[in-house]
């Protein structure tokens, strides 16, 4: 088989399974509204959970940062790309979340991969929740360590895997809020079992940070858990992009030496770091509290209005509200019907989710209004 035949076969297989992904160029893709092809839709596909992507204070901070520092960092943080803006953001994040250090990364994917590839050796073992993000599972699969997966949120299964002999160290990997189901990990129980077996815990709280807990400190703070490594991202609750790893001083020093994604990548622009500092100020303050409270009210209203629909609603109290449809073609058809009626919704299909669990991944944000939720419910009931 030639290269072209190999590529064509892979694409044909995706088409046959109604699993071929495509992108839509949008004029606006975050916030309450999505604009595409000169049409405006209520946006139920954005991760901008607090509606901060268009916040004037954050936009102003980015502009001022660009005027002060320029539009790029100019290099890796190990060379010339670590600015006083980066340093200030790291210090503020560490203080906010109760850690000694924070290290910035260009994306959550990079942060997750950096942690696992830097920490793990051949004699070690990674024990990951089966539904962990692709960045975590891919890094674990490619690392020299043994990878074992435990049944989703099943602490007893995790304990059995940790109890089997391992010549090296054990790293338990999970998420705070799961990206495709919207449910939460029992972090206190997971940490207890991990500590009983002398392991370390990594929590990716991409979808919890900024959105839940006191001052938006996320899943771990809410459950009174402090993992050895906490990954937070800035493309969701913060409304910007990028990520950080929170850890001890010694682990931070170690990652600065061995995390290749950090060493060999150009740092985020200092202006972006300034915007993130402004976003953090909103998240921690009274306005952040108000946005989280509004989002919680909208989530409750949405779930209460779904009674009678012939879909499986995931057990989620987060901004992620998946409607499990099952069949790929049906999920695509339903997403298109909703778009025709003014609601932009994305169909998520295998391999992103397990076979037979194609879904509409609905996301609610603090930018939405009550009437937006009511319209979405009306459209869903009309197409159920």
From Swiss-Prot:
One of its GO terms (biological process) is biotin biosynthetic process. The modification N6-(pyridoxal phosphate)lysine is found at residue 236. GO terms for molecular function: 8-amino-7-oxononanoate synthase activity; pyridoxal phosphate binding. Pyridoxal 5'-phosphate binds at residues 108-109, 179, 207, 233. Gene3D superfamilies: Aspartate Aminotransferase, domain 1 (3.90.1150.10), Type I PLP-dependent aspartate aminotransferase-like (Major domain) (3.40.640.10). Pathway: Cofactor biosynthesis; biotin biosynthesis. InterPro entries: Aminotrans_II_pyridoxalP_BS, Aminotransferase_I/II_large, AON_synthase_class-II, AONS_Archaea/Proteobacteria, AONS_Proteobacteria, PyrdxlP-dep_Trfase, PyrdxlP-dep_Trfase_major, PyrdxlP-dep_Trfase_small. Its cofactor is pyridoxal 5'-phosphate. Its EC number is 2.3.1.47. Substrate binds at residues 21, 133, 352. PROSITE patterns: AA_TRANSFER_CLASS_2. Pfam families: Aminotran_1_2. Keywords: Biotin biosynthesis, Pyridoxal phosphate, Transferase. Homodimer. Belongs to the class-II pyridoxal-phosphate-dependent aminotransferase family. BioF subfamily. PANTHER family: 8-AMINO-7-OXONONANOATE SYNTHASE, CLASS II AMINOTRANSFERASE/8-AMINO-7-OXONONANOATE SYNTHASE. Catalyzes the decarboxylative condensation of pimeloyl-[acyl-carrier protein] and L-alanine to produce 8-amino-7-oxononanoate (AON), [acyl-carrier protein], and carbon dioxide. This is 8-amino-7-oxononanoate synthase.
């Amino acid at each position: 088989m030639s290269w072209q035949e190999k590529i064509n076969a892979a694409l044909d297989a995706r088409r046959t399974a109604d699993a071929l992904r495509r992108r839509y160029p949008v004029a606006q893709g975050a916030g309450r509204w999505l604009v595409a092809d000169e049409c405006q839709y209520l946006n139920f596909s954005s991760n901008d959970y607090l509606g901060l992507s268009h916040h004037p204070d954050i936009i102003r901070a980015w502009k001022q940062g660009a005027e002060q520092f320029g539009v790029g960092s100019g290099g890796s943080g190990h060379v010339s790309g670590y600015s006083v803006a980066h340093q200030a953001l790291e210090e503020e994040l560490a203080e906010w979340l109760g850690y000694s250090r924070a290290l910035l990364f260009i994306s959550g994917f990079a942060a997750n991969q950096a942690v696992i590839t830097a920490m793990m050796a051949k004699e070690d073992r990674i024990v990951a929740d089966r539904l962990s993000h692709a960045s975590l599972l891919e890094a674990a699969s490619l690392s020299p360590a043994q990878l074992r997966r435990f049944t989703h949120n099943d602490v007893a299964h995790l304990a059995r895997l940790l109890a089997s002999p391992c010549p090296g160290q054990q790293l338990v990997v999970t998420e705070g809020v799961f990206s495709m189901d919207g449910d939460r990990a029992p972090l206190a129980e997971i940490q207890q079992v991990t500590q009983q077996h002398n392991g370390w815990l990594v929590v990716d709280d991409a979808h919890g940070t900024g959105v839940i807990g006191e001052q938006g400190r996320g899943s771990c703070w809410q459950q009174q858990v402090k993992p050895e490594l906490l990954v937070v991202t800035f493309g969701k609750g913060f409304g910007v992009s990028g990520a950080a790893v929170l850890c001890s001083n010694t682990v931070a020093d170690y990652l600065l030496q061995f995390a290749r994604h950090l060493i060999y990548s150009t740092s985020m622009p200092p202006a972006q770091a300034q915007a993130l500092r402004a976003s953090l100020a909103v998240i921690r303050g009274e306005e952040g509290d108000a946005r989280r409270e509004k989002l919680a009210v909208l989530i409750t209203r949405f779930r209460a209005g779904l009674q009678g629909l012939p879909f499986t609603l995931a057990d989620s109290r987060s901004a992620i509200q998946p409607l499990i449809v099952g069949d790929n073609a049906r999920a695509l058809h339903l997403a298109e019907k909703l778009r025709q009626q003014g609601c932009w919704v994305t169909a998520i299909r295998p391999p992103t989710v397990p076979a037979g669990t194609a879904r509409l991944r609905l996301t609610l944000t603090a930018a939405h209004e009550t009437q937006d939720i009511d319209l979405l419910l009306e459209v869903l009931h009309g197409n159920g």
